[in-house]
Swiss-Prot record:
Name of the gene: mnmG
Source superkingdom: Bacteria
Binding site for NAD(+): 273-287
SMART domains hit by this protein: GIDA_assoc_3
Subunit structure as annotated in this protein's UniProt entry: Homodimer. Heterotetramer of two MnmE and two MnmG subunits.
Taxonomic lineage: Bacteria, Pseudomonadati, Pseudomonadota, Gammaproteobacteria, Vibrionales
Keyword field contains NAD: yes
One of the Pfam families matching this protein, by short name: GIDA_C_1st
Protein's UniProt name: tRNA uridine 5-carboxymethylaminomethyl modification enzyme MnmG
Organism: Vibrio vulnificus (strain YJ016)
Any Gene Ontology CC annotation: cytosol
Signal peptide: none
Cofactor(s) needed by this chain: FAD
Gene3D superfamilies linked to this entry: FAD/NAD(P)-binding domain, GidA associated domain, C-terminal subdomain, tRNA uridine 5-carboxymethylaminomethyl modification enzyme MnmG/GidA
């Protein structure tokens, strides 16, 4: 049966990737359909109730800068906000917030239901309609056919999903939800490389059974940080603390004594788990010299008693989970509400993707989220936004777009995935970016909002706010540049109290702000340089841009040098065995990867600078490079 409407873009899956993909496509004016097996689980936080963190918070800010939803949702649902690495440099500072699961999901659903150009429909997808290597639509569980010019798959852990608790396993996409078996089988028929990954979740605890009097409280920051560039502290609900406990030798003994009942150690689970979020049994075995591990006790919301013990993800049997939980301080009488479990699922080698998230083998088919081997809500949201945008551009027969590595963590993400692939769940860190001084949380809008506006992703309200911030920054920098003091000026004693060495020559406000001991707040508290501007974001930019101006300029110069051939196109049909001088290894890797540009080719493992030089000469020979450009 054929559905009575056709669409420009269909998004399959309503998690963090799917919601951003659907909204991005709809924001650009394309007629978009979001298909989900259950409308009630749109925007659901399947694992930990938190958004952000090192590297992850940067992605959330970038999604927000391009008009995405995640930052606004957490601003309205966050029950504890903190800035991580607050004492370090601005490049590695990151925002993190605990979420009220119910508030978060409700905000996402409300936003989706009221989004122009977006239709929601509840049906699981079993099949793709593919004709002559181009996707034409999808077929649902009930045999309903939907036609579209582009399809985005954001299916999370549902493809061939298998849940493990102890030595027992069952099919499932997550606890309480069925897996997607038919679609997984269909995708395995297509020419993609497929493998298995694993992730897990801890048991949930009833807070009424916990003795908080013996636990260490961890409060949020005051004043609270804000995630969205359009956000405000007044959006935040009531703030509450998290708590900290620890595992101990008794905990570890319980785990060691029951490893034979672990599906991981019994060889039942084939998939590789996340390196940076290991199960408690993995931690105990890998770090055998440690007799304790810190566990963060995170509330799941303001209207529930459920707690999320971050750090004891496990697939051990339920009776062992009870022993583990009750061995920890404050949890001696704890009641488990939901057991922890591991889940295994299919993922597809992201090296089979273009930088637009379109698959190399099926035109118009895009993948985003855990299907690409990533882990985390934030990584999923970033991929979803970019895949939705590029699906929209594809449906309009326009050229796709993705940011470079030096423009955004979103650029680092797709570049890492599409050039190197991954053997384990991929998580973003600031250390993955070569140019992280330029890729800060605080300047995500300055890097991306103008481009997002050009692409149709940014509405008038956000655009007006962005331009007001730019104006405020420029005016304040000009004011500080043109305001001077000298050793004979009125107020010099007030200034010298803030300086390590007294001022002995004339200096502008910007000169003084460059001093390590001087902050913008201190400078503008002085009579000569008062008042500070009301726009706190603009004030922060003024301080960072002035203090780090030399370092920023140096990094920008390095980027310019490295970009000489970043976008030099490589022919899609080029047989690299025809390129004289390339080694057999390089030929094999290039013919397998089929990189779109020289920049991408240069980042494939084993591709040497010499090989790039040979390719430049070949491109010149076949007329795809201007004379002299190979030496540029």
């Amino acid at each position: 049966m054929l559905y009575h409407e056709t669409f420009d873009v269909i998004v399959v899956g309503g998690g963090h990737a799917g919601t951003e993909a659907a909204l991005a496509s709809a924001r650009t004016g394309q007629k978009t359909l979001l298909l989900t097996h259950n409308i009630d689980t749109l925007g659901q936080m399947s694992c930990n109730p938190a958004i952000g963190g090192i590297g992850k918070g940067h992605l959330v800010k970038e999604v927000d800068a391009m008009g995405g939803l995640m930052a606004q949702a957490i601003d309205h649902a966050g029950i504890q906000f903190r800035t991580l690495n607050a004492s370090k440099g601005p490049a590695v500072r990151a925002t993190r917030a605990q979420a009220d699961r119910a508030l978060y999901k409700a905000y996402v659903r409300d936003f989706l239901e009221n989004a122009p150009n977006l239709t929601l429909f509840q049906q699981a997808v079993d099949d793709l309609i593919v004709e002559q290597d181009q996707v034409r639509g999808v077929i649902t569980q009930m045999g309903l056919k939907f036609h579209a010019k582009a399809v985005v798959l954001t299916v999370g852990t549902f493809l061939g999903g298998k849940i493990h608790i102890g030595l027992q396993s069952s099919s499932g996409g997550r606890a309480g939800d069925p897996p997607s078996i038919a679609l997984a089988d269909r995708l395995r028929e297509l020419p993609f490389r497929v493998d298995r990954l694993k992730t897990g979740t801890p048991p949930r605890i009833d807070a009424r059974s916990v003795d908080f009097s013996v636990l260490e409280a961890q409060h949020g920051d005051n004043p609270t940080p804000v995630f969205s560039f359009m956000g405000d502290r007044t959006h935040h609900p009531r703030q509450i603390p998290c708590f900290i406990t620890h595992t101990n030798e008794q905990t570890h003994e319980v785990i060691r004594n029951n490893l034979d009942r672990s599906p991981m150690y019994a060889g039942i689970i084939e998939g590789i788990g996340p390196r940076y979020c290991p199960s408690i049994e993995d931690k105990v075995m890998r770090f055998a010299d440690k007799n304790s591990h810190q566990i963060f006790i995170e509330p799941e919301g303001l209207t529930t008693h459920e707690l999320y013990p971050n750090g004891i993800s496990t697939s051990l049997p339920f009776d062992v989970q009870v022993q583990i939980v009750r061995s920890m301080k404050g949890f001696e009488n704890a009641h488990i509400v939901r057991p922890g479990y591991a889940i295994e699922y299919d993922f597809f080698d992201p090296r089979d993707l273009k930088q637009t998230y379109e698959t190399k083998f099926i035109q118009g088919l895009f993948f985003a989220g855990q299907i690409n081997g990533t882990t985390g809500y934030e990584e999923a949201a970033a991929q979803g936004l970019m895949a939705g945008l590029n699906a929209s551009l594809f449906s309009q027969e326009k050229e796709g777009w993705s940011p470079r590595r030096d423009q955004a963590y979103m650029g680092v993400l797709i570049d890492d995935l599409s050039t190197m692939g991954t053997k384990e769940p991929y998580r973003m860190f600031t250390s993955r970016a070569e140019h992280r001084l330029l890729l800060r949380e605080d300047n995500a809008d300055l890097r991306l909002t103008e481009k997002a506006r050009e692409l149709g992703l940014v509405d008038d309200a956000r655009w007006a706010r962005f331009n007001q911030k730019i104006d405020n920054m420029e005016q304040e920098r000009q004011r500080l540049k043109s305001t001077w003091m000298n050793p004979a000026s009125t107020g010099i004693d007030e200034l010298n109290q803030l300086l390590k060495t007294p001022m002995n020559r004339e200096a502008s406000g910007e000169d003084l702000l460059r001093r390590p001991e001087m902050t913008y707040d201190q400078l503008t508290s002085l009579t000569a340089f008062a008042p500070a501007i009301d726009d706190l974001e603009a004030a922060e930019q003024v301080e960072i841009q002035v203090k780090y101006e030399g370092y920023i300029k140096r990094q920008q110069d390095e980027i310019e040098k490295s970009l000489r051939h970043e976008h030099t196109k490589l022919p899609a049909d080029l047989d690299y065995s025809d390129v004289k001088g390339l080694s057999n290894e390089v030929v094999l890797k290039l013919n397998t990867a089929k990189p779109e540009t020289l920049g991408i080719a240069s980042r494939i493992s084993g591709i040497t600078p010499a090989a790039i030089s040979i390719l430049l000469v070949h491109l010149k020979k076949i007329g795809m490079l201007k004379v002299g450009e190979e030496n540029a």
